[in-house]
Swiss-Prot record:
Keyword annotations: Cytoplasm, Glycolysis, Lyase, Magnesium, Metal-binding, Secreted
Pfam families reported in the protein's UniProt record: Enolase_C (PF00113), Enolase_N (PF03952)
Pathway where this protein functions: Carbohydrate degradation; glycolysis; pyruvate from D-glyceraldehyde 3-phosphate: step 4/5
The record's free-text note on cofactor binding: Binds a second Mg(2+) ion via substrate during catalysis.
Name the record gives this protein: Enolase 1
Function of the molecule: Catalyzes the reversible conversion of 2-phosphoglycerate (2-PG) into phosphoenolpyruvate (PEP). It is essential for the degradation of carbohydrates via glycolysis.
Main location as per UniProt: cytoplasm
Organism listed in the record: Methylococcus capsulatus (strain ATCC 33009 / NCIMB 11132 / Bath)
Catalytic reaction annotation: (2R)-2-phosphoglycerate = phosphoenolpyruvate + H2O
């Protein structure tokens, strides 16, 4: 007899910022058990699925998750009890129907995704398969190129940088293991450079350094210096990726680069700034270079820069097929950031990736700034065929857990493993 869902139990835990989040434990009738812990973001798109919080100012500043936990235990659990866990799409659709809203605001995406991921993880364990093989099929053997955050700014750090993330991509590495070596050596080189220049080497939410630099340009200069100091060739071995998170400094139609003192800019002027940077630095990817509602700006942005680099939509698209389809039709990007908790189920996330593939777009599987030790996204990245993964710096164990899981997967795959796009 095939195993069925026997119990579903949620509880509140804490993420990497000490903020409450949801953990779900799901047990099958064959004794298999699996858990899923859900992350949360600091910079969130206004069209994301709703992360349900309690709103009680007397507890965790209103950020408690007891409502979401209760929704799992009292609403979702009775509805999914007795169902077969490999019916992932059916279970996800059932939870969407139980919620009954367009953005999962009644039950909460944090509640629904916790169950969705736990169902997949339990089904894989029951089948005796690694999660990546269960979700993607036996032929999936491609490891993603990591986008590794080494300098933090914006909402992720208290620094003078307007832009949220400055990342490195080990594009010239022959394997994921070597990519991690390239990255860790560059990270340590940057740390020594910052120390020598008298900067603090404390880190931000995602593990990147957060020094008090004079400008966004200085951040890129330091990264190039670190790549070279580590013995690598900028652009050949290691490239740069940016996530300005431009919505965070966009006010009344103007981009205000106030932290770095670079003044106010229009959408066109921001695109021109990026164009100059691409000519000056080995930048291969820009995510959220403009604000989440600046669709006209993004069309120009992609028309000007899209032949040279990857233009990634995050807040603009929020892992939602409706917005991704619009962006494909309007040529507003050429890649999508994929966040499971932006849309709220495994099934809908897979559908978003299939739409990207159909359009010939790239995709980046992403963490959130408030993470947990859960490694679901690492397996998910391999299951979806590699692409790219963005899961923070080579620092802080909630980030390293994902990288170490990918190293384990590459080792298990042996000679069958492939790396990169």
């Amino acid at each position: 007899m095939k195993a069925r869902i026997e119990s579903v139990q949620a509880m509140p835990i804490y993420d990497s910022r000490g903020v409450p989040t949801v953990r779900v434990r799901l047990t099958l009738t064959d004794g298999t058990a699996a858990t899923a812990s859900i992350p949360s973001g600091a910079s969130t798109g206004e069209n994301e699925a709703v992360e349900l919080r309690d709103g009680d100012p007397k507890a965790h500043g209103g950020k408690g998750v007891l409502k979401a936990v209760s929704n799992v235990n009292d609403v979702i659990a009775p509805a999914v009890m007795g169902l077969e866990p490999w019916r992932q799409a059916e279970i996800d659709r059932l939870m969407i129907e139980l919620d009954g809203t367009a953005n999962k605001e009644r039950l909460g995406a944090n509640a629904i995704l916790g169950v969705s991921e736990a169902v997949a993880a339990a089904a894989a364990k029951s089948a005796g398969l690694p999660l990546y093989a269960y979700l993607g099929g036996a032929g999936q053997a491609r490891l993603p190129i990591p986008m590794i955050n080494i300098l933090n700014g914006g909402k992720h750090a208290d620094s003078s940088l307007d832009f949220q993330e400055f990342m490195i991509m080990p594009v010239g590495a022959p394997s994921f293991a070597e990519a991690m070596r390239y990255a860790t050596e560059t990270f340590q080189a940057l740390k020594s450079i910052l120390k020598a220049k008298g900067h603090a080497t404390s880190v931000g939410d995602e593990g990147g350094f957060a020094p008090q630099l004079q400008s966004n340009d200085e951040a890129c200069d330091l990264i190039v210096e670190a790549i070279t100091k580590a013995g690598y060739e900028p652009g050949e071995d290691i490239a740069i990726a940016l996530d300005p998170a431009a919505s965070s400094f966009h006010e009344n139609g103007v981009y205000r680069l106030t932290r770095s003192g670079q003044g106010d800019k229009t959408s066109s002027e921001m695109t021109d700034l990026y164009r100059r940077w691409i000519d000056k630095y080995p930048i291969v990817s820009i995510e959220d270079g403009l604000a989440e509602n600046d669709w006209d700006g993004f069309r120009e942005h992609t028309a000007v820069l899209g032949e040279k680099i990857q233009i990634v939509g995050d807040d603009l698209l929020v892992t939602n097929t409706r917005f991704i389809q619009r962006a494909i039709e309007e040529k507003s990007c050429n890649a999508v950031l994929i966040k499971l908790n932006q849309i709220g189920t495994v099934t809908e996330t897979v559908e978003a990736i299939h739409l990207c593939r159909k359009a010939g777009w790239g995709f980046v599987i992403s963490h959130r700034s408030g993470e947990t030790e859960d490694t679901f996204m690492a397996d998910f990245a391999v299951a979806m065929g590699g692409g790219q993964i963005k899961t923070g710096s080579v620092c802080r164990s909630e980030r390293m857990a994902k990288y170490n899981r990918l190293l384990e997967i590459e080792s298990d795959l042996g000679k069958a493993a492939r790396f990169g796009r």
